[in-house]
Amino acid sequence: MGKTGSSKVKEKIKIFLTIIFLFNILSAEGIAGFAGSFLRFGTTAYSMSMGGGFTAAFDQGFPGYQNPASVGFLNDRNVTVLHHFLPLDRYLISGSFSTKLPPSAGLGIGIINAGVDKIDGRDASGKQTGLFSTEEYAIYLSFANKLVKKISLGVNVKIFYQVLPIEGRINSKGTGVDAGFIYRHSKNLELGFVIQDWNASYAWNTGEIFNEKGSTYEDEFPMQIRAGFVYRPGSFDIIGDYTYFQMGNHVSSNRIRLGGEYIPMERIFVRAGINNFLPSVGMGLQYSLLKPDDAQLDYALVLGMRGEGLSHVFTYVLKF
């Protein structure tokens, strides 16, 4: 790429970052307290090290998580395990499997488990009553099909389960749907769009707590509407997306995520990104286990919001 082309790329990047700064006024912290927050945290080290804005990008570790249309571009069968080492006695672990369905489709299944341990229980007088824990599960079923070589449409069906340490551990169940598409315009540009957590909610029966005075309560997830891109100007990738969150008719928020990956040498990847101006960095190593370049180990270091500290994310992917 010549000096003129390089300067134009740098100018476009500067303009884009300026737009991000001007429009990212509302923080996604506004929806942090609503149901399903563990699904908005992120999954693989690969994606989180670049800010997590993978609406248009392909994440082989969990292709259906960010956009179900991604599984339409699978070329192999992938199995993935990941672990988040989180502060404040929190945890998140996940596993997924995905495969190509000839001639033009893909299928994926994944499970996410998150929770909090060592919750200090107290009675009305302040006396300690013990340590408690809470946990949530989400099962993803993803399917996508390429309408043409460059366009894939996909859908996720998600099943939720949550357990709270109230009255001997009560639980709730729920479902949700995602739908999206990805357009691979060229080897240098990809675009994506997804609606996530449509009609997603937990259904609680408060009669388990208040006996005959209880009722059925629906705890809705904020719906996400996202648009994203992948741009490859040279020896590195630029990945990002914009998310609009909608909760009923009254609560809304937004989020910008942006990151990049550079390959300094074969099979070595260096990454960095931001998620609403919270930085993250990471790296990846691809190697041969059973066949050439069939395994990858990724790591991400993520800075949380004030008071949260650092999170360490490890992901292992095997293609077969």
Name these PLM-found stretches:
Residues 3, 71, 105-106:
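A generic alpha-helix propensity feature with a strong bias for hydrophobic helices
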Residues 13, 18-20, 38, 62, ...:
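Generic intrinsically disordered, low-complexity segments enriched for polar/acidic and small residues
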Residues 62-73:
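N-terminal periplasmic accessory domains that precede
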Residues 29-51, 55-57, 76-79, 84, ...:
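Outer-membrane beta-barrel porins/channels
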Residues 1-36:
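Cleavable N-terminal export/targeting peptides
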